[in-house]
Amino acid sequence: MAINAQEISALIKKQIENFQPNFDVTETGIVTYIGDGIARARGLDNAMSGELLEFENGAYGMAQNLESNDVGIIILGDFSAIREGDVVKRTGKIMEVPVGEALIGRVVNPLGQPVDGLGDIETTGFRPVETPAPGVMQRKSVSEPLQTGLKAIDALVPIGRGQRELIIGDRQTGKTSVAIDAILNQKGQDMICIYVAIGQKESTVRTQVETLRRYGALDYTIVVTASASQPSPLLFIAPYAGVAMAEEFMYQGKHVLIVYDDLSKQAVAYRELSLLLRRPPGREAYPGDVFYLHSRLLERSAKVSDDLGGGSITALPFIETQAGDISAYIATNVISITDGQIFLQENLFNSGIRPAIDAGSSVSRVGGSAQIKAMKKVAGTLRLDLASYRELEAFTQFGSDLDAATQAKLNRGRRTVEILKQPLHKPLPVEKQVVILYALTHGFLDDVPVDDILAFEEALYDYFDVHYNDLFETIRTTKDLPEEAALDAAIKAFKEHSNFKS
């Protein structure tokens, strides 16, 4: 067989022309230190701040400190298998979490991985955990109410969709209960809820999940948990993962309620990471950017313009105080970022006033414009009346010689305090709140003994459900009070029918 040199030459030339180099160039570094959820690596000269980095054992970290000699990395997950000398490589990506409808009803960690034992989550969508907040022109003013189902909040410190309302108080004052009741009340309201548990005991998170499941609220809720036993980087990243999941729904035109329980523990985790990364400590050893830690998170909650779908994220961040000190560093930071605060007092809680809301220290800066007309009419003077009662009550400690007007104010105040009490996990629809507050402010409860107020309230709802459900329906559909004469007649008919009199 003759060998044709020209054919061989042409074949080799063609193969050289068609040759595609098949290799991957990745910038790598070497781990020089590992411990306490922190790694330092040398050789990653082009790493970006916030970039996701991969260790050779498959663990991931996030670049935080970009220094001249090395990169400070927080490790997202278990770091026990990482050793000094291990290779770490750049991914060219920033951290993302899975998002979408598939997450609803599930309990996940801050990386979006399921921890409820119900199998994998099938979702194709991802969002970066850190994204810019909507700009000024991308927002709308808060105009729609978010009903929590709690009379003390919906009447005194109303919340609107797109608002950030801080819940602040000592431990064991009912902060989580307020948020869980608000989530329960969103059933049938076309709201998606996200509960972010930061640094909580796993048994506590389990209890909250079971409560949500028992009342059917898990059908529209995502639970993101970074428990107390997990490394600080996961506690730090958990709120950002939660709001990234919320943003996916907001930009689809949906409404989301997100609860951060609580941001005090996130600040402590961030302080720990910052000190381990050798960042300069400031007041109370927190780093200088601890304000930015929370502001960039809470600014992502907004009511966006119609061009962006008209959706909203309403945030209820928690801050735990020590001995009721709301002037502490982290507390004042978050108060200045949010649109108001609900202050829960330990002495009110211990005296049986639950929810233990201190009306004098609580405020909603933008929620009033979202309150429905009916509630505005019946609760307009309630806050001032309550504050006046507290003041008079303090003065009566010094003597019992009171004129009739003062005695009447005290009697009305005691009934107001009783009416604003509410059992756990029993949120009320707004129409029932309006009717009982109307009865209170128009003097129908003045002759009812204080001890019978709660029984009177329950009986009134039952009576209206049977005989005057049309009044409830009017409030529900028109968002306004029905004819006062009709409401007066209905309440008088109930009082004649019942025996709640002194």
Curated annotation (Swiss-Prot):
Bilayer disposition of the protein: Peripheral membrane protein
Database matches in HAMAP family: ATP_synth_alpha_bact
Taxonomic placement: Bacteria, Bacillati, Bacillota, Bacilli, Lactobacillales
Site entry (Required for activity), positions: 362
Gene: atpA
Major subcellular location class: membrane
Designated name of the protein: ATP synthase subunit alpha
Name of a matching Pfam family: ATP-synt_ab_C
Claim: Hydrolase is one of the keywords in the record: no
EC number(s) on file: 7.1.2.2
Described purpose of this protein according to its UniProt entry: Produces ATP from ADP in the presence of a proton gradient across the membrane. The alpha chain is a regulatory subunit.
Top-level EC class: translocase
Subcellular location: Cell membrane
Residues the entry annotates as binding ATP: 169-176
Keywords: ATP synthesis, ATP-binding, Cell membrane, CF(1), Hydrogen ion transport, Ion transport, Membrane, Nucleotide-binding, Translocase, Transport
Catalytic activity as recorded in UniProt: ATP + H2O + 4 H(+)(in) = ADP + phosphate + 5 H(+)(out)
A GO molecular-function descriptor: ADP binding
Organism expressing this protein natively: Streptococcus pyogenes serotype M1
Gene3D superfamilies from the UniProt entry: 2.40.30.20, ATP synthase alpha/beta chain, C-terminal domain, P-loop containing nucleotide triphosphate hydrolases
Family assignment from sequence similarity: Belongs to the ATPase alpha/beta chains family.
